[in-house]
UniProtKB/Swiss-Prot annotation:
It comes from Debaryomyces hansenii (strain ATCC 36239 / CBS 767 / BCRC 21394 / JCM 1990 / NBRC 0083 / IGC 2968). Is probably involved in a pathway contributing to genomic integrity. It comes from the Eukaryota. This is Increased recombination centers protein 22. Residues 183-237 are cytoplasmic. Its main location: endoplasmic reticulum. Keywords: Endoplasmic reticulum, Membrane, Signal, Transmembrane, Transmembrane helix. Pfam families: TRAP_alpha. One of its GO terms (cellular component) is endoplasmic reticulum membrane. Residues 21-161 are lumenal.
Length: 237
């Protein structure tokens, strides 16, 4: 069976409306006897009653196993689904509908295929509800696979992560630039304005010469010699 472009286009349109609507397996499958099951290849030990521990930034692969119990051929043409709230079934995030194969499953036969899912969700608890789209003769139907409880966690951040180191370097450089700017505009002026002014030391003045007492109250050099002789002769008497 060869799918035309119009069928692929219809697949995407149906996926967008069907995924957002409440799950109604009876209405979706039209009561076709087509059994769908899957395992998560990264967690093969996880069963439908367990909780899968998933990590953001990684990808998981759903390995489908389908069995056609009808008396006519059925072709798997696409995959989709959603992550729902496990408490009330409301859709939190839709999975992008994507074309598959088509994978022809003859009457009474089995087949397998893989759906890859990139994880980029808000860390929370979810119910993973995959869907597959099948072409039955001229009809396009979707089949709701079982739900899988899952917890999505964020990837732990390493201190040696290159992106984190780059952001830290940018942050430190920015803070350093701001501090230098503040210091250059206000800090330097404040420090210069409050710094104590050093007093200049004065040179000690040389001591004045001390006059030696000679018993005279005046300098006799300017007195005429005759006057001095006269004064001495008076003292002799």
């Amino acid at each position: 069976m060869k799918l035309s472009f119009s069928i692929i286009t219809a697949l995407v349109a149906v996926a967008s409306s069907a995924i957002a609507a409440p799950i109604d397996p009876e209405k979706a499958t039209g009561s076709i006897n087509f059994v769908v099951d899957y395992t998560i290849s990264e967690f093969p030990e996880i069963s439908n009653t367990d909780v899968a521990e998933l990590t953001n930034g990684e990808a998981i692969s759903l390995e489908y196993s389908v069995t056609n119990n009808e008396d006519k051929d059925i072709s798997v043409v696409g995959v989709g689904g959603s992550f729902r709230d496990p408490a009330n079934g409301n859709v939190k995030t839709n999975l992008t509908a994507a074309a598959v194969g088509p994978v022809l499953v003859a009457a009474g036969e089995k087949a397998s295929f893989i759906q890859k899912i990139d994880l980029n969700l808000v860390a929370d608890n979810y119910l993973l509800t995959p869907q597959i789209f099948v072409a039955v003769e001229e009809d396009l139907k979707f089949i709701q696979a079982r739900g899988q409880l899952a917890t999505v966690n964020d990837l732990p951040i390493s201190l040696f992560n290159l992106q984190l180191l780059f952001l830290e370097a940018v942050l430190l450089a920015t803070i350093g630039g701001i501090l230098y700017f503040v210091y250059d505009i206000w800090g330097k002026r404040y420090i210069e304005g409050t710094a104590p002014i050093a007093k200049s030391s004065k040179k000690a003045s040389s001591p004045s010469p001390v006059s030696v007492a000679t018993g005279k109250a005046y300098n006799s050099e300017w007195i005429p010699e005759a006057h001095l002789k006269q004064k001495k002769s008076k003292k002799a008497y």
